[in-house]
Structures are given as structure tokens and as C-alpha cells.
Swiss-Prot record:
Entry GO CC: cytoplasm; perinuclear region of cytoplasm
InterPro entries from the UniProt entry: Leu-rich_rpt, LRR_dom_sf, NACHT_NTPase, NLR, NLRP_HD2, NOD1/2_WH, P-loop_NTPase
Protein name as catalogued: Protein NLRC3
Subunit structure: Directly interacts (via CARD) with TMEM173/STING; this interaction reduces TMEM173 trafficking to the perinuclear region in response to interferon stimulatory DNA. Also interacts, but to a lesser extent, with TBK1. Interacts with TRAF6; this interaction results in decreased TRAF6 'Lys-63'-linked polyubiquitination, but leaves 'Lys-48'-linked chains unchanged, promoting TRAF6 protein degradation. Interacts with PIK3R1/PIK3R2; this interaction disrupts the association between PIK3R1/PIK3R2 and the p110 catalytic subunit PIK3CA/PIK3CB/PIK3CD and reduces PIK3R1/PIK3R2 activation.
Tissue expression summary: Expressed in bone marrow-derived macrophages.
Organism annotation: Mus musculus
SUPFAM superfamilies according to UniProt: P-loop containing nucleoside triphosphate hydrolases (SSF52540), RNI-like (SSF52047)
């Protein structure tokens, strides 16, 4: 057999052998075996020891069967590799509406090329039970879009099985394709087995356990007759000849061969023919990751690194191309087309040759490659092209007619009778052009099957045929009989094609219409002029076609996939004004007024294709309920969705709940902050969380869900196992609401971030949360700030911290906690080994509480972030903290701003910094440490090698303190951020800092805002930057410089340090 595989270059075929057996007894034995008559066969074998079945052991026959399979699938070294990308599949629970109803391209585009998070199953476990109490699947179904590698997967599995790497429970694997089955009108189970084993010179099957046979049926989408399970008569007789589709239906049902395992591969849309109840296991082949795309292209250009870099750059720069390149077959086609383009650029030395921006432009380059147009000048048609133009046009015309009618009839595999019926000259099918478009394959019935290398090529060729035929046709080209109401002129036929495409429920004409539109774009006309198109003929149609397309953007309640496809068609036509205007409105924040059907459709299109919607689609302050409702079908596929501040009320949550409940839902993060959501809206969202399996982050801050809404969400958390982050900040849930949430945390083991700030939570709520923390094993961050838990609430949480060894971040800001509460918290911190961040801002911690903090910090080795801002530490408390800083070996961030700290405490902290080797951030702003305190800290900077950020805003620092800091910066090589805003360093201080900048190489940000620098001070700093190339940002605002002088200094800084951003 001559077979061409998807990863082989165009025009290449492999010689392979079809394996089988002969002998009436052997066939009967196998059929009986598969039909569930194993015991009878064993008895017959025992009575006939001289038979082939009784004379050879099973072990001796299996190697021969394996050798035959290896011969059939070839010896590609990649097959059988444990690192093969098809070594694992995704377990899925069923087909989604998107898979059942939409074109393969639409599936990839709508999901942004990101596959649904799913459980992964390795190939060696594909047919094994998932648990100890389950049974192996009898019928397995693997789905994947066109070109993703379903046949390659089958070959990979067969190769691995033949080498004993997978499927060790099977003694026989019987692979068969629907291309083979299409050659039969009727077939019995008996003849089916004979057709598989027709060429091995002995009966190679023996009586074995019947469940050790795997029948593989590859390519259900290529079956010429749809499977109709409801209208097919049951048949259990393996000798009875019935229609092939009935035979397959009865095998899947188990009426025939009930003991064997059946594995079917299919495109998603065709897989819907099989009732879900008959499928025991469904898997999906994922597309290529970014790294796998790179590897795929590297394999195409192993010795052309420059070319590889150019192709990769173009793919990564064009979002539409990148998304489709997640499909391996398309990735290879793209590589071939772009490789030819860049070679042509090099040959003609024309770097301005335009790069493809649309699919039609890409396929036009592929056609140029197929026509052999290397070295073609962009202004002229090469002699070689001229020589093949007439023959190519005729061949493409006949192939196009075949492709078009196949597309209309959902036919993707053609046989010799089909080729002859459409006037295809079989003798010419081996030329370069045809080998780039078609692949040829011999079937088991010794006939020849043809199909286009990829479905999209069939659609492109069909579009070229329709484009040419519609100029002279007087009847509807979609009508099989050729008779219809007269349609005169290209526009009438284009309108007909657009109507057919937009009315098709399965989207099978979507990409065809895109290509048909793209053939009218100026670039495509230039690329194909003289070969497939006539020069300039697009000009008279282009604007009118754009009007026709825009006429299909109806004011429907929801934007459907067909409407979005119209935007794709306009993009192919290079008529992008509508999409660009909406995209610009999104960037500028003026989207709120764009509510027309065309604007909504363009917005849905941009959700798929625009970088502005990736990784997050931000629709804050711009959506109404009506617009949101129209976008719902497309919001399903957003990874991250921000809908803040849109005045959404409870009815909108019912709509969003329906989206989150959908099987297709891919939303992982959704923010609904600052809307008007009440408890009814929260309940609607909670109902969706009961079934949703994608959402990991839900932000409901600043709404009004109250205790009833919190209870509904808490009940959902008892069942939901995907949500990891929930924000209920500012929702007035009070103690009653937090009690329900705490109860849910006892059983929920996935929530890791819970935000309950500003919810009027008191002692009772804190106690309930503390009890939950003693049992919860997942929560890592609890945001409890701006409530009223007081000391007793803090004591309850402290008791929980003695038990809980999971929580890492605890925020108790502004909770009326005094020394008593802090003291108990610190005792817990002495034994707790997981808490790394503690926020005690805006409480009432005095020097006595600071003493307890010091004792804890000297013993604790896990706390890294401690925030004591706006407490009552004074010098005595800060000095106590300084003792801990000198001894602690884990703290990295310490915030002491606004604590009435003066020079004495700053001196103690300076001494501690000379000993500390972990602190990277110290914040002392709003403390009157003065020049003396600044000098003490500066002295520490001369020896400290870990501090990165120092905040000294509004710290009463004058020129002397600035001079001390300047001296330290000439020595220090680690400090990157120095903030001196709101001090009074003056020109003298500025000069000292400027001199330091000439020598310092580590500082990246310097803030001298509001420091009375004057003109001279600003000039000192600006001049110093000519010798400093490390500073990235400097702020000189709020200094009495004057507008003209500020402009001059800004220009000077930009000249001296072009990489430095200046605010002045």
C-alpha cells in the first residue's frame, strides 16, 4: 500500500504492507472468538490438535502479528517515543455545544487555542480501569479537530503496542479506517475480519480471552453514511451482510463482537452521532503548546536557523496564525508557506514583500509554492509560472469543483469514481501542484482514496472554484441539479454563499466564506494574479461585498458564531474599519456608547482575536445588561473577565450564572466588583458554582450580598472543588454570613485565598473562623481587615494558629487589637511554622505589645512580612523591634511608618541593620527621625548588603541627612529604591545626592519630590545623570523650579540618561 501521513512532505508516499490472515478455519475461529463464542472455540481446538490454532502457541503468534503491524505503520523513530506529545490524552466528560455545532477553526479561535483543564490519562492506561472498583471501557472515543493528529495517535499506539509498551492486556490490535470501509456497500462481520487480515500467509490468530482484542476504527468523520442508531435494526449474526453503517452501529452497540474493545477516533462534530450512553470513555487530543509549535517548526528547518527565526517571529506576531498553529497540520502548512515566502524575499532581495496577515494570504503563498514560483518578482509573473498557468488553472478548477461539492455534501474522502465524475485527470495527480493539495491512499479493497492534505485546503480550493464559476454561472451553484432561480453576476452568487454560510447550523461553510471573501483582497489578488486570478478584478467587487457582509449583522438577542464569522470575512477582505474602531474604543475607555449590533459583533470578534482582550478582557464601566446579554455566548471562552463598576444588578447574575453553568465554560477568573449585586444575585452565582468546573477566582467586593448571599455561596463551596480565591470584601455579610463561610471551610479543601475585609464582623465571626482554621487544610491567605474583632477575636485566631500549619498570610489591619490581643498572637507565632505575612496596621499596639513582638521575632524563623504601620510604638517600642531585627533571620519586609518614631529609635534600627542579613524593605515614612536618624540609617547602608528599598518620606530630613545618605550611596551597591519625598534636603542635599549618583550603580528609583531643591538642586541632579546609567526613574515634582526651567531640565535628563523616566 502507498500511504502518505500528515507529517510527511507534500508529494511523498510510503510503501506499507497490509497485514491479515488466510484460511477458512482461521477466519471462522476469529469471528467466533469476537462474537463471544470463545469456549466453543477452545473445545474445537482441543479436538483438532493438528489445526493451525492448536499447533502453535499464542506466544509464538503474537510476534508475527506485531511485526505485521509495525510494517503497516512504518518505522518512524518518533513513533513509540515516551516523550511523544501524544503519549497522553485529556479525559473529557462529553461533547460541548461548541464542538457539536461549530467548525473546527471556530473551536480553536473561540477557545483561544487553550484546551479545557482536564484530567490527563497516559496512553498506557487508555483502556484500563480508572480505579480499583471500575471496569475497563468497552467503547472508547477519542476526538480532535482536523489535523490535530488522530491518525498519528493511532499509529503511535499501534507502534507502542507492537513493541510491548502499551495495551499489554490486548493480544490482538485490529486497526481499520473508515476510508477502507467506505469502499463497501454491504459487509458482514465475517468479511470485516477477512478484510483486515488478508495478506499474512497463515492464520495468525488463536483462541484467546475475547476481551483481549482491540478493534480500532479511525476517522468516523470520513464515514460516507451517517450513523443512525435510532433507525438501525439489531443484528447479532456475524455472517449476515448488512450496510456498513449498520455493521458499525451494531458493533458499537455490542450486538456484534460484544466481548472486544472498540476504539473510535473522530472530529468532534461527527462524534455526536454516537449516543453518549454507548461511550464508556471519551478523550481529546490537545493542540500544540507554544514550545511544541517551536519544536514543530524547528523540525521543518533543522539547518536554517535564520529562516526558522523569521517564521517563528511571524507566527508569534500574528495572533490568528498563532492560534491555528496549535493544530499540528496547520502549523506545518504555515511553516511551508512562510518558508517559501522568506526564501522568495531572499531570492529577489525584496525585504518589503508583504507578510501574510490573513489566512487567505497565507494559503495564497502556499499555492505559489505549489506552483513552483520561487524567485518570482512581485511585479511580474515568472516564466515558470506562465508555463504552468493554463494547466494549473484547469487542474485547480476541476479539483475546486470536486472540493466545493464535497464541502456542500460533507464529503472529505474521494475515490476514483468521484474523481472521474468531476473530470479530474488521474494521470496528473502526481504533479507538484496536486501532491501539495491531495494525498493518495490505497484501501484494503484495492481501490484508491484521495483527500485534501487538510480540510482547510479543500475549503480554499472550493472557494477559488466558486469565485471563478460564479462569474459565468446563471443558476445557484449550491443546487445539485443545477436548476434554480436565475442568479446573474458575482455579487448575486456571493450573497447566496453568504446566506448559506450564515444559515448553516454546523458552521461547515464558515471558512469557505472567509476564503471567498479573502480572494477579493488586494494582496491576495497580487499574489495569485496570472495563476488563479485576473489582475485587478477584485476592485469592482470589494466595497460591495463588504456591504453585503455587514448586512448580515442582524440585531439578534445574542451574537452568534455565524455573525462573528462575518467579522472574520471582513478581516480577510482587509475591510477592518469596524473592528479597529471598537478596538480603539476599548483602549481609550470610550466603549460605553457602542451598542449597535455591528459594534457588539465586533466586540465578540475582538474577544477572540485582539491582544487587548488577552490575558484579561476588561469591560469595566462600559457594559449595560443588554450588551452583556448579547455577548454571553462568547464570554464562555474568556479566560479572565473583569466586569467591575457596571451597575449590574441581580438579573444580570442570572445571565452570568447560566454562562458559568455551561459545559463549554472556560472562564477561570471573573471580577464583579463595585456593582449592585444583592443576595438574589449571589444565589444565582452560587447555583452555577455547584456545577462549574473552570472558575478559580471570584471577586464580588463592594456589593451588597449580605448574610443570605454569603450563606448561598458557602453552601456552594461545600460542593465546588475548583474555586481557589473568593473575595467578599465590603458586602455587609456580618457575623451570620461569616459563620456560614467558616462552616464551609471545614469541608472545602480548595479555597486558598479568602477576602472578608470591611464586613462588620465581630467577635462571634472571628471565633467561628478560628474554629474553621483548626480543621481547614487549604486556606493560605485570610484577609480580615477593617472589621471589629478586638482583642478577644485576636485571641481566638491565635489559638487557631497554634494548630493550623497551612495559613501563610493573615491580615488583621484596623481591628481594634491592643497589646493584650497582640501578646497572645505573638505566643502563637512562637510555635507556628507557616505564617509568612502578618498585617497589624492601624491597631493600638504600644511599646508593651512591641516587647511581645520582639520575643516572637527572636524565636520565629518563618515570618517574612510584618506591617505595624499606624500603631503607637513610639521610640521605646521601635527600639524593642530593632533588637529583634538584629537577631531575626527571616524577616524581609518591615513597615513602621506613622509610629511616632524619632532619632533614638532610628539609631537603634541603624545598628540592627548592620547585623541583619535578610531585610530587603524598610519603611520609616511619616516618622520624625530628622537628620540624626537619617545619618544613623545611612551609616548602616555602608555595611548592609541586603536592603533594597528604603522609604523615608516626610521624615524631617534636611541637607545634613541627605549628605549622610549621599556618602552611603557612594559605597552601597545593593540599594535600588530611595524615597525622600516631603523632606527638606534643599540644594545642598541635592548636590550631595547628585555626587553620589556619579559613583553609584545600583540605585534604580529616586524620589526627591517636594524637597525645596530649587533650580540649582535640580541642575545638580540632571548633570549627574550623564554619568549614571543605572537610574530608571526620578521624581522632581513639587520643587520650586518653574515651568520653563522644569522643561529644560527634563530635556537635559532625557539627553543625559535616555533610559531614565523623569517626573518634573
Amino acid at each position: 500500500m502507498r500511504r502518505r501521513y500528515s507529517h510527511d512532505p507534500p508529494g511523498s508516499f510510503r510503501e506499507t504492507k497490509v497485514f491479515g490472515f488466510r484460511g477458512e478455519y482461521g477466519c471462522k475461529a476469529l469471528v467466533d472468538l469476537l462474537a463471544g463464542k470463545g469456549s466453543q472455540l477452545l473445545q474445537v481446538r482441543d479436538k483438532m490438535p493438528d489445526s493451525p490454532l492448536g499447533s502453535q502457541s499464542n506466544e509464538s503468534r503474537i510476534p508475527k502479528h506485531s511485526e505485521a503491524l509495525l510494517s503497516r505503520v512504518g518505522n518512524d523513530p518518533e513513533l513509540g517515543s515516551p516523550s511523544h506529545r501524544l503519549a497522553s490524552l485529556m479525559l473529557v466528560e462529553g461533547l460541548t455545544d461548541l464542538q457539536l455545532k461549530e467548525h473546527d477553526f471556530t473551536q480553536v479561535e473561540a477557545t483561544r487555542g487553550v484546551w479545557h483543564p482536564a484530567r490527563v490519562i497516559t496512553l498506557d492506561r487508555l483502556f484500563l480501569p480508572l480505579s480499583r472498583v471500575s471496569i475497563p471501557p468497552r467503547v472508547s472515543l477519542t476526538i480532535g479537530v482536523a489535523g490535530v493528529g488522530k491518525t498519528t495517535l493511532v499509529r503511535h499506539f499501534v507502534h507502542c503496542w507492537a513493541r510491548g509498551q502499551v495495551g499489554k492486556g490486548f493480544s490482538r490490535v485490529l486497526p481499520l479506517t473508515f476510508r477502507d470501509l467506505n469502499t463497501y456497500e454491504k459487509l458482514s462481520a465475517d468479511r470485516l475480519i477477512q478484510s483486515i487480515f488478508s495478506s499474512i500467509g497463515e492464520a495468525s490468530l488463536v483462541a484467546t480471552a475475547p476481551d483481549r482484542v482491540l478493534l480500532v476504527l479511525d476517522g468516523l468523520d470520513e464515514c460516507k453514511t451517517p450513523l443512525e442508531f435510532s433507525n438501525t435494526m439489531a443484528c447479532s449474526d456475524p455472517k449476515k451482510e448488512i450496510q456498513v453503517d449498520h455493521l458499525i452501529t451494531n458493533i458499537i452497540r455490542g450486538n456484534l463482537f460484544p466481548e472486544i474493545s472498540v476504539w473510535i477516533t473522530s472530529r468532534p462534530s461527527a462524534a455526536g452521532q454516537i449516543p453518549g450512553g454507548l461511550v464508556d470513555r471519551m478523550t481529546e487530543i490537545r493542540g500544540l503548546t507554544e514550545e511544541e509549535i517551536k519544536v514543530c517548526l524547528e523540525q521543518m528547518f533543522p539547518e536554517e536557523q535564520n529562516l526558522l527565526g523569521q517564521v517563528l517571529s511571524q507566527v508569534q506576531a500574528n495572533r490568528a496564525l498563532y492560534l491555528m498553529c496549535t493544530v499540528p497540520a496547520f502549523c506545518r502548512l504555515t511553516g511551508l508557506a512562510l518558508g517559501h515566502l522568506y526564501r522568495t524575499r531572499l531570492a529577489v532581495q525584496d525585504i518589503e514583500l508583504p507578510l501574510p496577515q490573513t489566512l487567505c494570504e497565507l494559503y495564497s503563498w502556499y499555492f505559489r509554492m505549489a506552483l513552483g514560483g520561487e524567485g518570482q518578482d512581485k511585479e511580474k509573473v515568472s516564466p515558470r509560472i506562465k508555463q504552468v498557468t493554463q494547466g494549473a488553472r484547469k487542474m485547480v478548477g476541476t479539483l475546486g469543483r470536486l472540493a466545493f461539492h464535497g464541502l456542500v455534501k460533507k464529503k472529505y474522502v474521494f475515490y476514483e469514481q468521484d474523481m472521474k465524475a468531476f473530470g479530474v485527470d488521474l494521470a496528473l495527480l502526481q504533479n507538484t501542484l496536486c501532491s501539495c493539495l491531495l494525498q493518495r491512499e490505497e484501501t484494503l479493497a484495492s481501490s484508491v482514496a484521495y483527500c485534501f492534505i487538510h480540510l482547510s485546503l479543500q475549503e480554499f480550493v472550493a472557494a477559488t472554484y466558486y469565485y471563478s464559476a460564479s462569474k459565468r454561472a446563471i443558476f445557484d451553484l449550491f443546487t445539485e441539479s443545477g436548476m434554480s432561480w436565475p442568479r446573474l453576476g458575482f455579487l448575486a452568487h456571493f450573497r447566496c454563499a453568504a446566506q448559506r454560510a450564515t444559515q448553516a447550523k454546523d458552521g461547515r461553510l464558515d471558512v469557505f466564506l472567509r476564503f471567498l471573501s479573502g480572494l477579493l483582497s488586494p494582496r491576495v489578488n497580487t499574489l495569485l494574479a496570472g495563476s488563479l486570478l485576473s489582475q485587478g478584478e477584485h476592485q469592482s467587487y470589494r466595497d460591495q461585498v463588504a456591504e453585503v457582509l455587514q448586512g448580515f449583522l442582524h440585531p439578534d438577542a445574542a451574537v452568534c458564531a455565524r455573525a462573528i464569522n462575518v467579522l472574520y470575512c471582513l478581516s480577510e477582505l482587509r475591510h477592518t474599519e469596524l473592528a479597529c474602531s471598537v478596538e480603539e474604543a476599548m483602549r481609550s475607555g470610550t466603549l460605553a456608547g457602542m451598542t449597535s449590533p455591528s459594534h457588539r459583533t465586533a466586540l465578540a470578534y475582538l474577544l477572540q482575536m485582539s491582544d487587548i482582550c488577552s490575558p484579561e478582557a476588561d469591560f469595566s464601566l462600559c457594559l449595560s445588561q443588554h450588551v452583556l446579554q448579547s455577548l454571553l455566548p462568547q464570554l464562555l471562552y474568556c479566560q479572565s473577565l473583569r466586569l467591575d463598576n457596571n451597575q449590574f444588578q441581580d438579573p444580570v447574575m442570572e445571565l452570568l450564572g447560566s454562562v458559568l453553568s455551561g459545559k463549554d465554560c472556560r472562564i477561570r477568573k471573573i471580577s464583579l466588583a463595585e456593582n449592585q449585586i444583592g443576595n438574589k444575585g449571589a444565589k444565582a452565582l452560587a447555583r452555577s458554582l455547584l456545577v462549574n468546573r473552570s472558575l478559580i477566582t471570584l471577586d464580588l467586593r463592594s456589593n451588597s450580598i449580605g448574610p443570605p448571599g454569603a450563606k448561598a455561596l458557602a453552601d456552594a463551596l461545600k460542593i465546588n472543588r475548583t474555586l481557589t480565591s473568593l473575595s467578599l470584601q465590603s458586602n455587609v455579610i456580618k457575623d451570620d454570613g461569616v459563620m456560614c463561610v467558616a462552616e464551609a471551610l471545614v469541608s472545602n479543601q480548595t479555597i486558598s485565598m479568602l477576602q472578608l475585609q470591611k464586613n462588620l464582623i465581630g467577635l462571634i465571626g472571628a471565633q467561628q473562623m478560628a474554629d474553621a482554621l483548626k480543621q481547614n487544610r487549604s486556606l493560605k491567605a485570610l484577609m480580615f481587615s477593617s472589621n471589629t474583632i478586638g482583642d478577644r477575636g485576636a485571641i481566638a485566631l491565635a489559638e487557631a494558629l497554634k494548630v493550623n500549619q497551612i495559613l501563610e498570610n493573615l491580615d488583621l489591619q484596623s481591628n481594634s487589637i491592643s497589646d493584650m490581643g497582640v501578646t497572645v498572637l505573638m505566643r502563637a507565632l512562637c510555635s507556628n511554622q507557616t505564617l509568612s505575612s502578618l498585617n497589624l496596621r492601624e491597631n493600638s499596639i504600644s511599646p508593651e505589645g512591641a516587647q511581645a513582638l520582639t520575643q516572637a521575632l527572636c524565636r520565629n524563623n518563618t515570618l517574612k512580612h510584618l506591617d505595624l504601620t499606624a500603631n503607637l510604638l513610639h521610640d521605646r517600642g521601635a527600639q524593642a523591634i530593632a533588637v529583634a531585627v538584629g537577631e531575626n533571620h527571616s524577616l524581609t519586609h518591615l513597615h513602621l511608618q506613622w509610629n511616632f518614631i524619632q532619632a533614638g529609635a532610628a539609631r537603634a534600627l541603624g545598628q540592627a541593620l548592620q547585623l541583619n542579613r535578610t531585610l530587603t524593605t524598610l519603611d520609616l515614612q511619616e516618622n520624625a527621625i530628622g537628620d540624626e536618624g537619617a545619618s544613623s540609617v545611612a551609616g548602616a547602608l555602608k555595611v548592609n548588603t541586603t536592603l533594597i528599598a528604603l522609604y523615608l518620606q516626610v521624615a524631617s530630613i534636611g541637607s545634613q541627612g541627605a549628605q549622610a545618605l549621599g556618602e552611603a550611596l557612594t559605597v552601597n551597591r545593593t540599594l535600588e529604591i530611595l524615597d525622600l519625598r516631603g523632606n527638606d534636603v534643599g540644594a545642598a542635599g541635592a548636590k550631595a545626592l547628585a555626587n553620589a549618583l556619579k559613583l553609584n550603580s545600583s540605585l534604580r528609583r529616586l524620589n526627591l519630590q517636594e524637597n525645596s531643591l530649587g533650580m540649582d538642586g535640580a541642575i545638580f541632579v540632571a548633570s549627574a545623570l550623564s554619568e549614571n546609567h543605572g537610574l530608571h526613574h526620578i521624581n522632581l515634582q513639587g520643587n520650586p523650579i518653574g515651568e520653563s526651567a522644569a522643561r529644560m531640565i527634563s530635556e537635559a535628563i532625557k539627553t543625559n540618561a535616555p533610559t531614565c523616566t523623569v517626573e518634573i
